[in-house]
Amino acid sequence: MLGTLGLWALLPAAVQAPPNRRTCVFFEAPGVRGSTKTLGELLDAGPGPPRVIRCLYSRCCFGIWNLTRDQAQVEMQGCRDSDEPGCESLSCDPSPRARASSGSTLFTCSCGADFCNANYSHLPPLGGPGTPGPQGPQAAPGESPWMALALLGLVLLLLLLLGGIVVALLQRKAYRVQSGPEPEPDSGRDCSEELPELPQLCFSQVIREGGHAAVWAGQLQGELVAIKVFPRRAVAQFRAERALYELPGLQHNHVVRFIAAGQGGPGPLPSGPLLVLELHPKGSLCQYLSQHTSDWGSSLRMALSLAQGLAFLHEERWQDGQYKPGIAHRDLSSQNVLIREDGSCAIGDLGLALVLPGFAQPRAWAPPQPRGPAAIMEAGTQRYMAPELLDKSLDLQDWGTALRRADVYSLALLLWEILSRCPDLRPDGRPPPFQLAYEAELGSAPTTCELWALAVEERRRPDIPSSWCCFATDPGGLRELLEDCWDADPEARLTAECVQQRLVALVHPQEAQPCPEGRPHSHPEDWPPAPAPAPALLPGSPQPGACHFGVQQGLCSRNPGAACASSDV
């Protein structure tokens, strides 16, 4: 029988865990998929494996071994993403999980002490009692009576628990009869107490219904407004979105304007918390593109305004004595972008938006932080999710930058949808009917697995027709812009600020490429105006000319071979 792996001898005694931080052995065999290195901070414990990792999200180590008839081979060691059952053990006691292949079995353990995953106490012989066989785990001789007694005890415990619940319910009912009706839960009552009534608010019709809220069209003091009504069970979602809209400095032409928060309800419906927002009668970008085509100037106006709105959200700034943090939208889709009266875009629905870590926030600034990797990687519409969100490989060490990159990927899909309805980019002037991104490849309701296979495994993107080069300042300008935004490598993507600069360059081209089909270009008066210069960015933020998210960032040039002046992040 194999002994311990003896990995303790390879760990330097100088590696000590700080208080409240678990330190584990880290190892991943070649070919293992799904790295866990982002769940902790890797430390240099020696010239070769195993290494040491300091856990960020749990106080639990794990180990996985592959037992064959000849030997036990380490497959993975590291930190778990949460404290699971079994993590209270101070030693690694592996248990069989599955048959990796014929003649081998995977064993895993969880433990809650520093370096506890370096050694295992014992492994049963392959094919012995407790090792999974073709029909699953086999019970050892003599286990059946003990198992029956354990089940009997569990049944008795459940019966006692049910009896206690029944008695408690009867006592509560008797108390209600004596003391009158019970008040509503605290969460709903507190929310109602702090929200004003809006007696002049009128509801007209439902625009959209979702999982956490319904959006109505209505009026407030004679102004047409959109009213987002939350049920009482969604008070937490209401508070999170309200807190974002009420951030100082969050006013921009291309972000939906927040008007008020209050309580109420349409007609006889029960009142609940609500947000009053600016109404855009032309509807969402998806609805608009389904019913209209847009010439070159109008398409650029939509694309540029969308990039300006996202760049504003991502930007961290001080202006007029007010601090605005960077914000990741995390649910950028053509349903959540609205069309203004002038044909430009306004980004809405901040229900999943997240305040990002900053470089120069005030000392008293303490925004709520996401709790663990799952909260950081939460995203909205699957169709627009970046590859690193689909395969759960988002960079958790610098999650603020990583979420900005994921937004830029979604932005690229929206730009493709806008340009796909531009007749000036078609030889015959007839764009096809509107389709969402990946709808041609996967249909109207793709599954997560289908999106993963297409966007992650095959690295495919929506088709870019060759005729789109006609209106770029250099051949392939539009193609290069989209490809630089939806690159499979997040670090290679443009920033939203750089997307804005490239679109400005397309609005005012120096030389227009002749279109082979002879279609005329749009007139200059149809082009959208250049954006006003943005206020100075904070020290340490990406500079206005910085294109990519990498450490070395170059100026915004459409020539990939041109020399780029680097700037510090």
UniProtKB/Swiss-Prot annotation:
It is a single-pass type I membrane protein. One of its GO terms (biological process) is BMP signaling pathway. The chain crosses the membrane at residues 149-169. The active site is at D331 (proton acceptor). It is an enzyme of class 2 (transferase). Belongs to the protein kinase superfamily. TKL Ser/Thr protein kinase family. TGFB receptor subfamily. This is Anti-Muellerian hormone type-2 receptor.
